[in-house]
Amino acid sequence: MKKEIIIGTRSSPLALWQAEFTKAELSKRFPDMNITLKLVKTTGDVLLDSPLSKIGDMGLFTKDIEKHLLAGEIDLAVHSLKDVPTGTPEGLVITSFTEREDTRDVIISKSGKGLMDLPQNAKMATSSLRRMSQLLSLRPDLEIMDIRGNLNTRFKKFDEGDFDAMMLAYAGVYRLEFSDRITEILPHETMLPAVGQGALGIETRTDDAETREIVRVLNDDNTEMCCRAERALLRHLQGGCQIPIGSFGSYIDGTLKLLAFVGSVDGKTGLRNEVTKAVKTPEEAEAVGIELAEILLSMGAEKILADIRKTC
């Protein structure tokens, strides 16, 4: 067995938390292994002046790390799964899906008021078209304002800027110990999360069987079933830019329930549906994702997505 493992990661506080978590979990199982981190600056860490909706988010936070992985300079890469494009580069594979944190989104507000109690025309900070679409469907009066940067930077910008509220993923807020700032946790009925939200995806080379075997011990089977279904749905619908799609899967006693949303950026058009099926394998879970994607397309999702792609 390998005596040394090099983990590639971004240098943001949340990315470092994720990498250190992975290192600690591997060290518990392989105490004699020397595990080190290699920090990689990604395009997404550099391009902070433009909204994600303008520059797209396809691999902004993963491509540069993947180059190091393909070159053999690192043995594995740890990503927020929601940042990982559904089509991984040839030669790479998501080997492990870690146990998922709470997938919901949260509201941070300066007034302490929740989403529906914010004042008329409140200024809401988010860089996500998925959140924007669902927010505007509920509160068309909101003024959506872009906010970029790592979590610590966003909190600083929010506190110092002209914002009434901000929306973030619970998982990151919790992991970096900002939970005391949460005003409201939004249920899935209100806000479906990003595909893979709350889970880590550990990526390895397909030809590195030894590392894949090592990393596989961190896999959570329930998380894999849900995330494989969500990612299959996104892959079946996805264009080349950021689009307003949300999805959440739950897998209990052999039954997978998959929810999904596709909406227009202005929130005026939104489609939701779900599929519930008994599944036994990740491949069967992916088939559920494709089935739900086809249902959404038959409901009119293609027109919504085509209109959005015209602006990409």
UniProtKB/Swiss-Prot annotation:
InterPro entries, per database record: HemC (IPR000860), Porphobilin_deaminase_cofac_BS (IPR022419), Porphobilin_deaminase_N (IPR022417), Porphobilinogen_deaminase_C (IPR022418), Porphobilinogen_deaminase_C_sf (IPR036803)
Cofactor note: Binds 1 dipyrromethane group covalently.
Organism: Chlorobaculum parvum (strain DSM 263 / NCIMB 8327)
Cofactor (UniProt): dipyrromethane
Keyword annotations of the record: Chlorophyll biosynthesis, Porphyrin biosynthesis, Transferase
Similarity-based family: Belongs to the HMBS family.
PANTHER family (alphabetical): PORPHOBILINOGEN DEAMINASE (PTHR11557:SF0)
Catalytic activity line of the entry: 4 porphobilinogen + H2O = hydroxymethylbilane + 4 NH4(+)
Protein name, entry field: Porphobilinogen deaminase
One of the GO BP terms on file: chlorophyll biosynthetic process
EC code(s) of this entry: 2.5.1.61
Signal peptide: none
Note: The porphobilinogen subunits are added to the dipyrromethane group.
Role: Tetrapolymerization of the monopyrrole PBG into the hydroxymethylbilane pre-uroporphyrinogen in several discrete steps.
Positions bearing S-(dipyrrolylmethanemethyl)cysteine: 241
CDD domains for this protein: PBP2_EcHMBS_like (cd13646)
Assembly, per entry: Monomer.
An annotated GO cellular component: cytoplasm
Disulfide bonds: none
Keyword Transferase: yes
Pfam families on file: Porphobil_deam, Porphobil_deamC
Pathway entry: Porphyrin-containing compound metabolism; protoporphyrin-IX biosynthesis; coproporphyrinogen-III from 5-aminolevulinate: step 2/4; Porphyrin-containing compound metabolism; chlorophyll biosynthesis
Entry GO MF terms: hydroxymethylbilane synthase activity
